[in-house]
Amino acid sequence: MAKQGALSALSNGGLSELWARLRFLFLAIIVYRIGAHIPVPGINPDRLAALFRQNEGTILSLFNMFSGGALERMSIFALGIMPYISASIIMQLMTAISPQLEQLKKEGESGRRKISQYTRYGTVVLALVQAIGMSVGLGSQGVAFSNDFGFYFVAVTTFVAGAMFMMWLGEQITERGVGNGISMLIFAGIVAGLPRAIGQSFESARQGDINIFALIGVGLLAVAIIAFVVFIERGQRRIAVHYAKRQQGRKVFAAQTSHLPLKVNMAGVIPAIFASSILLFPASLGSWFGQSEGLGWLQDVAQAIAPGQPLNILLFTAGIVFFCFFYTALMFNPKDVAENLKKSGAFIPGIRPGEQSARYIDGVLTRLTMFGALYMTAVCLLPQFLVVAAHVPFYLGGTSLLIVVVVVMDFMAQVQSHLVSHQYESLMKKANLKGYGSGMLR
């Protein structure tokens, strides 16, 4: 009886960590959603609503989607997580081209902490630039009640503090919750806006502004995209690997056959988020500073890279392709994999171990990455054309669907991993307790 109680306590203790992580995740999302509804002092809500009605369907809609609706409320989280994402992109690019940062990255945990510290400094700088631009834009367009230094100081301080809190919250979710914190915050913002967008679509269809058949077609397209994304994200290219017969001491290991799994889309949803962030930064500057005297060309730039424009499509496609290859290269090194296979006595049939195996794996990975980049571009851009043509809210775009589906799949995979890990630990502890009990009987 005592032994069964001990086993039950061990099992419950294992699952309690998962429940604690889930509770922290939900609490963090609740805090994020509460903050998204706290407005910055000194904002005229009527003028703000009129401003967003004028800019409906522009790049601001995408910016508002990533901020979870905080931008249109001009809340303390209006900048969202984009300054941190932009700083992360810059730091990763600099790490790839700077020998000093590359060496710092190889120093282990201390080096990674140093790079994270540099990323935070970059986040402060970018958030400050965007906060100043947003505050000046609000003042020049009459959205602020009083266009004085007091408003600018309070607004800039609030925006920067909100962006830094979002960065901290995302890091805490990654460390103490489940899933990638940044992706979870973006996911929460998109999902929070979906009910409103769907309700507006049905209301527009009821009033005759949208063809009901077009709305049904968009809904079926969304279901098809979700199924397609799940199919591709679960897809793998398996490279056959053989282990030769070997002997270690007195033990003889028979020849074995295994495989090296390579995901079709190894970069996940990161390229879509990074490419969107690259477009959002200059577009946001153009939207806020474009009204100022002598800076009208910035507004022309913002209009040129608005959703549906040829330049937007070209830059977005180039960004996705670049970040697919860049992020895959950061995550997976064919030379290291080939070297590890050689050290373990494994080889790819028909391929010489070492350099030839590395070139073969790199070739397979390049083809997979190109297919993954084309798949992600199609998912993000094709629905955008149909959504714009049917005048459906931007929330139903391909980028948002891709982020939602991939984040949910990653979340479920991590929960399953925690469950399997705890079951394994429970079995091992159970075996140890049985061995201890039989020893006591002797």
Swiss-Prot record:
Swiss-Prot/TrEMBL keywords: Cell inner membrane, Cell membrane, Membrane, Protein transport, Translocation, Transmembrane, Transmembrane helix, Transport
Cysteine disulfide links: none
GO cellular component: cell envelope Sec protein transport complex; plasma membrane
Compartments (UniProt record): Cell inner membrane
InterPro entries linked: SecY, SecY/SEC61-alpha, SecY_CS, SecY_dom_sf
Chief localization: membrane
Single annotated GO MF: protein transmembrane transporter activity
Database matches in Gene3D superfamilies: SecY subunit domain
GO BP: any one term: protein transport by the Sec complex
Pfam family, one: SecY
Spans traversing the lipid bilayer: 24-44, 76-96, 125-145, 149-169, 178-198, 212-232, 269-289, 312-332, 363-383, 385-405
Secretion signal span: none
Membrane topology label: Multi-pass membrane protein
SUBUNIT field: Component of the Sec protein translocase complex. Heterotrimer consisting of SecY, SecE and SecG subunits. The heterotrimers can form oligomers, although 1 heterotrimer is thought to be able to translocate proteins. Interacts with the ribosome. Interacts with SecDF, and other proteins may be involved. Interacts with SecA.
Family assignment from sequence similarity: Belongs to the SecY/SEC61-alpha family.
PANTHER family given in the database record: SECY/SEC61-ALPHA FAMILY MEMBER
Primary role: The central subunit of the protein translocation channel SecYEG. Consists of two halves formed by TMs 1-5 and 6-10. These two domains form a lateral gate at the front which open onto the bilayer between TMs 2 and 7, and are clamped together by SecE at the back. The channel is closed by both a pore ring composed of hydrophobic SecY resides and a short helix (helix 2A) on the extracellular side of the membrane which forms a plug. The plug probably moves laterally to allow the channel to open. The ring and the pore may move independently.
Protein name as it appears in the record: Protein translocase subunit SecY
Organism: Pseudomonas aeruginosa (strain ATCC 15692 / DSM 22644 / CIP 104116 / JCM 14847 / LMG 12228 / 1C / PRS 101 / PAO1)
Gene (UniProt): secY
